[in-house]
């Protein structure tokens, strides 16, 4: 799809499962060298092994994205393994579902560290390498929850994802000095391993509420991230792409009908 991705060195945080796994696989198919980062060692190694078994290049690094030393180690290992860093996909995130009245303040802090602080750390750790390269790409995985809509039990998640977009705007201005673009993909309802626990009836109802009548696939998010990383998107920074199958359109139509 995008020949400029071939031989690029890419980090995907939260790359062992879900959306991150999809992003890693999409980049690997385009010939990128992918460093998969996650806390889960077994899952991370399995994902890297799967990519290699399909002809791709991938390694795994265990990483706590909320810890500065761990993120620096991730970047250093990427350089050791692949000779540099070209693309940072800050995808890692957590989304426990707890209503505000029941939420422990520590849970709020944990979600902010995993979802928001991690984006800052990944960008900060990448800048020296991007400066050395003469440029680079950062892609954040945000969400429609928070910036566009809300969902009961996800006040902390929504706040963290909204915070990512605030960070994105200022980061795009600061990173331009290094010829680095930073953009965000905002997924809607994407089918991942975790959703299977909800049951088929619930998933069918969820899909029926989406104009395209299906849940998104992790590769849909990977393809959007791939676009932002490509040479063809080199004049785009500080922007977002909503990948939701038109999920938020009915809400807009309902608002218009009420006028």
What are these regions (language model features)?
Residues 4, 237-259:
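Short C-terminal tail/terminal secondary-structure segment
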Residues 63-73, 105, 219-220:
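The beta1-alpha1 cofactor-binding region of Rossmann-like NAD(H)/NADP(H)-dependent oxidoreductases
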Residues 16-18, 40:
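Conserved glycine-rich cofactor-binding loop
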Residues 176, 181, 236-238:
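Short, small/polar-rich loop/turn modules that mediate ligand/substrate recognition or access, typified
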């Amino acid at each position: 799809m995008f020949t400029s991705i071939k031989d690029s060195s890419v980090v995907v945080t939260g790359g062992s499962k879900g959306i991150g796994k999809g992003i890693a696989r999409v980049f690997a198919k385009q010939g990128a060298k992918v460093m998969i980062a996650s806390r889960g060692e077994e899952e991370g190694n399995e994902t890297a092994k799967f990519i290699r078994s399909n002809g791709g290049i991938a390694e795994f690094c265990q990483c706590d994205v909320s810890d500065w030393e761990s993120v620096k180690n991730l970047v250093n290992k990427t350089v050791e393994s692949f000779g540099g860093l070209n693309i940072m996909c800050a995808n890692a995130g957590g989304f426990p579902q707890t209503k505000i009245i029941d939420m422990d303040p520590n849970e709020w802090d944990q979600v902010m560290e995993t979802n928001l602080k991690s984006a800052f750390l990944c960008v900060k750790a990448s800048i020296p390498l991007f400066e050395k390269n003469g440029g680079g790409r950062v892609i954040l995985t945000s969400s429609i929850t928070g910036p566009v809509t809300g969902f009961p039990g996800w006040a902390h998640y929504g706040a963290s994802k909204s915070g990512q977009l605030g960070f994105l705007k200022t980061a795009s201005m600061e990173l331009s000095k290094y010829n680095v673009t930073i953009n965000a993909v905002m997924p809607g309802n994407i089918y991942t391993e975790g959703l299977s626990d909800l049951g088929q009836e619930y998933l069918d109802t969820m899909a029926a509420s989406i104009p395209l009548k299906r849940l998104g696939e992790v590769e849909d998010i990977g393809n959007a991230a791939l676009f932002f990383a490509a040479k063809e998107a080199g004049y785009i920074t500080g922007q977002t792409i909503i990948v939701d199958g038109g999920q938020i359109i009915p809400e807009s139509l309902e608002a218009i009908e009420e006028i």
